[in-house]
Amino acid sequence: MPKHFNTAGPCQSDIHYMLSPTVRLPDLKALIDGRNYFIIHAPRQVGKTTAMIALAQELTDSGEYTAIMLSLEVGAPFSQDPGMAERAILDEWQESACVYLPTNLHPPRWPPSQPGRQIGAALASWAKVATRPLVVFLDEIDALADETLISVLRQLRSGYNRRPRAFPHSVGLIGMRDVRDYKVKSGGSERLNTSSPFNIKAESLTLSNFTLSEVEELYLQHTQATGQVFTIEAIQQSFYLTDGQPWLVNALARQATQVLVKDITQPITAEVINQAKEILIRRQDTHLDSLAERLREDRVKTIIQPMLSGSDLPDTPEDDRRFLLDLGLVKRSPLGGLTIANPIYQEVIPRVLSQGSQDSLPQIQPTWLNTDNTLNPNKLLNAFLEFWRQHGEPLLKSAPYHEIAPHLVLMAFLHRVVNGGGTLEREYAIGSGRMDICLRYGKVVMGIELKVRKEKLDPLTQGLIQLDKYLNGLGLDTGWLVIFDRRAGLPPMGERISTEEAISPGGRTITVIRS
């Protein structure tokens, strides 16, 4: 079977394009050689499981170690019953060992032991009879919680001093969150009698996104296998859109090569990558859908809502910010502050949040189109004003984020517009005081800026300056500035909507819409 780009589960080197795990985790071999216990944490679907399965295989094939990746996930339903969790986990481990290890390296039958001791007893018995030093990577450690998580961590700590003769030579805990957060899931550090729930760890490592050169290396594997070329611009665009997030990098390439350009004599261009991006965002595959589900959690909403509106981040618990970082939903900008992790997520988040408003939209005739189906900006303005007068206020209730409900309803309307053959692009950031939208429909390009007025000071002057800069980047001479007035005691938004023309500092004609 020819190799392809993988988006479902761990990669398998015989059928998937993939990067070497030793390249992605260059310091890990030295940690293992030094009999260290360690943590590897990273967001979901960045290749943790793939890398560790491949590394275990490399270590075993070298003849130096018996190395294996084992999962703890089957113990997740038994958070209050360590005994049941241990039995489920150990059954899974026996099956995995039969699949991944040669017969002469299989573990013995697990010895009988009391609940709360079975994991440690099994690892001890295996280490004692192993003909090579035993290296174990325990995946999905943060699937466990409460009593079961405490029990597993304590058993590993208890056996640590007996390594390597009577306990594994090296153990790696693999999960989404860092060790500092295990105590949160286990009910607090006082229940572990230590300030750290895993104080035997030597290092806490993370698996980073692909670099630009790694994206190029991955895509080059396809070129070498098929002859189909990814242009330099396509590789750069893929890296820009994904920030190197491995699932997204693979997903774009999969769409490009298996759906959009099946003819291997034709190159994959930047335009093809952009088309692949639109398909992914519209489809919202499992990876994107799982992130979207998180948006309704209060600790996520508290941080994402001000990012969308351009407000300052309120006082939030450090653990909430770390949670979003560990999810891979946001990242720390080199310039300071939190930003959405990559441009694809930046598109997905407002689309998902405006979906409820989209589903609540009444049937709207596309009166914004000319007879030749081109977009008419003046007709679009009139259609929006009429829509807002009739439906704006009721639709605000359908928006999941109250503070930016007007933004979401406006975006729902604009999505109805571009569904006929256009695109929306958004820019937003903490503390920017705005959201910028670029609407493209055929040859028509429109720049729109959204601002919220919460205080007496009118944001018009600042908005004109900001919109001027945005329109300059788009090469446009006109744009919309939409100001949503959220001060108390005002008439309904639909009743007070108005428009006026203003000239920006750069001499551009701006349509100011107030509501």
Residue spans of the language-model regions?
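Active-site metal-binding core of divalent-cation-utilizing nuclease and nuclease-like domains
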Residues: 416-443
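Walker A/P-loop-proximal flanking segment of P-loop NTPase domains
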Residues: 1-46, 50-59, 121-126, 383, ...
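Mid-core helix/loop region of P-loop NTP-binding domains shared across ATPases and GTPases
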Residues: 92-151, 161-170
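Winged-helix-like regulatory helical subdomains adjacent to P-loop NTPase cores
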Residues: 213-216, 220-327, 333, 364-370
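Conserved catalytic cores of phosphodiester-cleaving nucleases, focusing on short active-site segments
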Residues: 437-439, 443-454, 470
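Conserved NTP-binding/hydrolysis module of P-loop NTPases
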Residues: 8, 67, 72, 79-103
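Nucleic-acid nuclease catalytic cores
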Residues: 460-464, 468-499
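The catalytic "switch" region of P-loop NTPases
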Residues: 8-10, 148-241, 259, 263, ...
